[in-house]
């Protein structure tokens, strides 16, 4: 278990009265990764098109980032569009492409003002419209010097695809089999400097990984709140962090 000492909130963090009093400031996860699940079910329960669920999820994303900033989390990664999502109906895929483009148009300046660096992880293949790639590049360039928090949007991303791409890059370099180890593969991941997630939060109560950050989450703590993503708020993020703090991370070792 974590230490009974709760630490003190760093003075440089914004004051958020909704942060629980029992948060242990000495054990804040450095990297939180979120699977934003439940948009379709949220919409269906309200008799709305699935696309309305995706639209409603924007507020949840921004509030989760604000919550991460209030805790001093250095990295937060959002599963925005998976390599498997291409199998969804064409109308929904088109909507998601346009939605993510417009989301960046609406939110990039706001996130930049908050000191958030925006990055993207995933394949930049022919299926992703050029206008979307352009907007991604513009957002990344705008925020590249920010260091308060890094928001990585996993877009056209798959954990297996990332590992395959890393191995392909090694082969293309002419790497010999006996020289390929974990360090070599990590150097060829989409963002080698990104620390492994300490905490993975998947909303909607589903207990699955869904091909997300397979290499990086080997020793992550997993939390599965029942709330659907559009209803997710920073209070749910704080509850997930409290659950994380109640656990002892062993990394394959024995209980201390």
Task: Give the residues covered by each predicted segment.
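Flexible, compositionally biased loop and terminal segments
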Residues: 1-256
